[in-house]
Amino acid sequence: MSQEEVVFEESKQGIKIVFWGATMAGKTTALSLFHAIKKREDPENVYNFLKLEDKATERTIGFDQATFGLGTGTGREFKYHLFTTPGQDRFKSMRKIVVNGLHGIIVVLDSESARWEENKTSLTELFEILEDKLLNGEVKLQIMLNKMDLPVGTRISAADVGRLMVEAGVSDKLRDTFASVHEVSCLEALQALKETWSSGNWNPKSRPQPVQRIIMPIQQVIRDILVAELSKN
């Protein structure tokens, strides 16, 4: 069994969450940042971290995956698995494989105005694959709007995401999913991590705002999944 097959088998136990978005939107960077933060704050609950990328272009060519533990207070080990999907057009079939069996999804939108069409195509494809599960609440959804460090005038804001969804044909479908749009900058979060760690002033209770913005949608989708699972019992 290959490493990729092992990862998929293990993800059947626990929570599976997928980062979805157009190529170069920031999916791998967001996952890498979260992994780095958890490794510093809670290393005992950080497991494998697998990256499959083209070294020349630094683009994901399969999927990225990281596994983390979640304390339950009962002594029972519980894991959540974070995946990214490859964004390039040629990997559409791979994206369908990666989202199989997921519990939650984080859509990463690229705020650069020039990437409007790529974002729209990505949203349309997502609903072609997961519409029923998103609409019935089986799959929980949060949205990251990345690259908010770009100059105003060259990027969109959270206020523009509604229009993007209308053009993608998913606005009405998303109305009842209770998804929040989180404005983030992976670049600013990375810079904040480097500065805080080099100064020795890292405090999990007062993380820099750019870092906290990356963590919030991940924590929210995990919380939504757990609440839904507990309500079944």
Q: How would you describe each model-predicted region?
A:
Residues 47-90:
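Switch I (G2) and immediately adjacent beta-strands of P-loop GTPase domains
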Residues 151-230:
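Canonical P-loop GTPase G-domain recognition
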Residues 88, 101-123, 149-156:
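Conserved Switch II/interswitch segment of TRAFAC-class P-loop GTPases
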Residues 130-140:
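A short helix->loop->beta-strand "cap" motif at the edges of active sites that frequently abuts
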Residues 82-84, 106-110, 142-146:
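Conserved beta-strand segments of the P-loop GTPase G domain that flank and frequently precede/overlap
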Residues 34-35, 65-69, 122-131, 159-169:
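Short, well-ordered amphipathic alpha-helices
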Residues 2-55:
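Conserved G1/Walker A P-loop phosphate-binding module
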